[in-house]
Amino acid sequence: MSLTIESDGKGSRELYEEQINISYQYKLFMKRPERKLRNQYRRITIDLAAALVFLLFGIIEGFVYGFETVFVMLIVVCIVFIGIYGRLLYTMRKALRKALEDNRKVVVCIDEEGIKYHKEDGMDLNLKWSQVAFARVFSKVLTFFSDDNIVISVNRTHEKEVMDYIRENGIKVRVIGEPGFVSVSAGEQ
């Protein structure tokens, strides 16, 4: 017996932003699964604004006092920082736009062996329960993290079905919720 969840592939902007933020913070969650999900878009935008202010400050100071080594270094560091963070923000926005435009059907099948993710005309992922490091409940998705860089997310509207299936079949997986949620082992009753 297995649990099959089908989706038309049309999700909200907030859902995809959360999934992208989870993907970009994967390594941080693997080190500390309970950590709070940070909004990378906002953080990067604020950092870029600060770098632009410092760049402007460096250029103005350079014109007023002359371009000394310190000001030139400040300008170069700001330009490099703006380039790196600008590229990261562009990549994240591109991933969001691509996700919003992708209307392919998605099927997630959960059984005693593990989780199978299939996207119509495309990606197939198989994750065995022994590979699942933990599952984490976020505001929009329930996400399964593996040690080998695979992340499979299920819309939170299916959380109860998934958790009931895991409990009923005695599958051992550590589940971590949003802040305030008590960490449980889903296979134990």
Spans of model-derived segments:
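N-terminal membrane-targeting/pre-transmembrane regions
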Residues: 1-51
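Alpha-helical transmembrane spans
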Residues: 36-102
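Conserved beta-hairpin
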Residues: 85-126, 134
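K/E-rich alpha-helical interaction surfaces of small helical-bundle regulatory domains
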Residues: 130-138
